[in-house]
Swiss-Prot record:
GO MF annotation list: rRNA binding; structural constituent of ribosome
GO BP, sorted A to Z: translation
HAMAP family for this protein: Ribosomal_uS5_B
Assembly description: Part of the 30S ribosomal subunit. Contacts proteins S4 and S8.
UniProt superkingdom: Bacteria
Domain S5 DRBM: 16-79
Primary gene name: rpsE
Gene3D superfamilies: 3.30.160.20, 3.30.230.10
Function, in words: With S4 and S12 plays an important role in translational accuracy.
Keyword Cell cycle: no
One Pfam entry name: Ribosomal_S5
Family of this protein: Belongs to the universal ribosomal protein uS5 family.
Name of the protein in its database record: Small ribosomal subunit protein uS5
Keywords noted in UniProt: Ribonucleoprotein, Ribosomal protein, RNA-binding, rRNA-binding
Amino acid sequence: MSKKSARNIKPGELNLKEKLVHINRTAKVVKGGKRFGFNAIVVVGDKEGHVGYGLGKANEVQDAIAKGVEDGKKNVIKVPIVKGTIPHPIVAKYGSAKVLMKPATPGTGLIAGGAVRAVLEMAGIHDILTKSLGSSNPHNVVKAAIKGLQSISDANDVAERRSKTLQEVYES
């Protein structure tokens, strides 16, 4: 997917839903004891091919979630979905987290765990096989999944890159 088309998405026009992936409590040690803060990873999507993630930090959980949702709306990408799945297998890596995603036949279901499941549900993918390898840190797993979905090229992108028609791409 080209970066140009990702910038054309206007989150205000989409009916975005949010899903909380992870909340982390942090502590800062001060003279009088510990001061707690929170950060939240939130995935937003319309379940029709648009998905984004955001990280919010605040002193209260609800504020952190709200900030995460706002950040997520700024990072929305378009995912090409073909018959409820992805067009081709992908392996994406972010930090030490690695996510493997394979297309599946209709009726297989969403086979994914933890953070990857949230991303794929919000994107609207119904049939897919995934495996999360390496680090299980939700921050990096979400970013690896988004990076993988962003790297998907549909038939139109391939035809454009090869300077061919869509028919020629399918014949080759």
